[in-house]
């Protein structure tokens, strides 16, 4: 997949560099990013095959758990074009404050 919007996660990591657990979160994010870039997801089921705990939303967005359930990443996946757009990255508490269907 072509992944766009990585600057959202990078900005989050830069802003929270000293926080407990952020290094582990960054490593897990980088692992997720490597998988996403190699992926050829053509259907939501393809996402679920590689990320069984991902949530496929009605809006077509996908919510990925990063570092267990400590962090969330919301992405829009354009299956036909092979593009994944990161729309949100933050803690689970941050995630609870946004509308994942519209962000």
Segments predicted by a language model, with ranges:
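Basic, Lys/Arg-enriched alpha-helical interface segments
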Residues: 1-70, 78-83, 92-103
């Amino acid at each position: 997949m072509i992944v766009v919007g990585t600057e959202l996660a990078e900005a989050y990591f830069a802003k929270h560099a000293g926080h407990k657990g952020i290094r582990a979160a960054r490593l897990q994010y980088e692992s997720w990013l490597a998988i996403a870039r190699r992926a050829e997801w053509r259907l939501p089921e393809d996402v679920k095959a590689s990320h069984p705990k991902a949530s496929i939303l009605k809006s077509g967005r996908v919510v990925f758990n990063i570092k267990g359930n400590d962090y969330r990443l919301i992405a829009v996946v354009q299956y036909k074009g092979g593009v994944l757009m990161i729309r949100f990255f933050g803690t689970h508490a941050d995630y609870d404050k946004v509308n994942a269907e519209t962000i």
